[in-house]
Amino acid sequence: MKRIVVTGVGMINALGHDKSSFDAITEGRCGIAPITLCPTEGLGTTFAAEVKGFDPETVVKKKEIKKMDRFIQLGLHAAQEAYDDAGLDGIDCSGFGVVGANGIAGISTYEAAVERKCDGAMRHISPFLIPSYISNMLGGHVSLRFGMTGPNLTTTTACAAGTHAIIEAYKTLQFGQCEGMIVVGSEAPISPVCMAGFGAMNALSTRNDDPLRASRPFDSERDGFVMGEGAGALVLETLEHAQKRGAAIYAELTGFGESADAYHITTPHEKGRGAKKALNAAWKMAGEPQIGYINAHGTSTRYNDLYEAAAIFECFGDAPFVSSTKGQIGHTLGAAGAIEAVISILAMQRAILPPLVNYRESEPEMAPIKLVSERTVSSGIGAVLSCNFGFGGTNAAVVFEKFSL
């Protein structure tokens, strides 16, 4: 088996435009506020975790902006940071591949086109419409930017897409299809229809009078998730290739797990069956290391948090620290796995664990996992796990360990 390592990371979220946002996350700050990106009239939820002050011209030329939805722009921003962080500038990256990830893709662009149809303006539909919003164009733009001619894939497995993208990159490298991969999960789902759709499912928090305290993973008073946007990116390479070019190494990807609940289209299995299977598979593949920290899916919804806690406890007991950063940056859907993998890796590298903001206490029936209620310094963590679950009952988990020869 080839050893697969992480040599670069990047992210953009509601608390910042690069990996330095990790500091804001560990300080317990929250990026949730009233929505400014779209009209909120008639919506049951009027707040979200928006990326503030993002200027797409920092990533693409002005004339190119109209050719890509915001989710592509955010993804390119994170990808550029990971590319630079990995020291790939000036290196021939034609042997690299790309895996993009999203769940909703360019929904805002699509909504705008539908509005034009309703207004009778079909003749004014842009020729760039389709390539500006379809899901695989994130990976397409990344490969174009960096000249990466290896496999170009896209995962669209709802909220597990980012984690599945990491797994697909691992598999591609193991099979020798290329020497490096860049994984980019990105989402820009804050639109009227998207907010209304999730609201109709009673999936969103409705604490419009208190947005900062709305997302409260594992807390007994949680009432739904908070929509978020952003992107995360990781550069993965075979150890041989990374060493050959003298790359700095963040962590080693040692295990992954995938499963399906086969239970319900949106509700997780009541005993955490699929989640447990994915968690256990990732841990077993990694060689059963001592997991020191888990960045949980932790959506702040009634059932996910309850059943996920049960799965974690059954697999690992109360040994690992557990938190969910969705309390600060919202639920970024298909981007969550990539963003949270970056956060998990940085937590292990810097020995600082992100706290659960807004957490007070869990309901009595929740499994007694070791929740991180405040910023925690823990230097003894050698392995971390990040997991995500999506509609359709799809589950994915990955294990990263500190790198050593």
Stretches with model-predicted labels:
Residues 1-64, 240-252, 342-356, 396, ...:
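ACP-dependent fatty acid/polyketide chain-elongation machinery
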Residues 1-6, 93, 286-290, 367-405:
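Flexible, low-complexity linker/loop segments at domain and module junctions
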Residues 2-7, 29-34, 209-293, 405:
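Condensing-enzyme catalytic core mediating Claisen C-C bond formation in acyl metabolism
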Residues 6, 19, 29-157, 186-195, ...:
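Conserved beta-ketoacyl condensing-enzyme motif
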Residues 8, 25, 79, 98, ...:
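Conserved small-residue
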Residues 75-87, 135-187, 225-247, 332-353, ...:
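Active-site-proximal alpha-helical scaffold in enzymes
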Residues 119-126, 167, 171, 188-244, ...:
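Glycine-/small-residue-rich "gating" segment that lines the acyl/pantetheine channel
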Residues 177-223, 256-270, 296-305, 319-369:
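Acyl-CoA/ACP chain-elongation machinery
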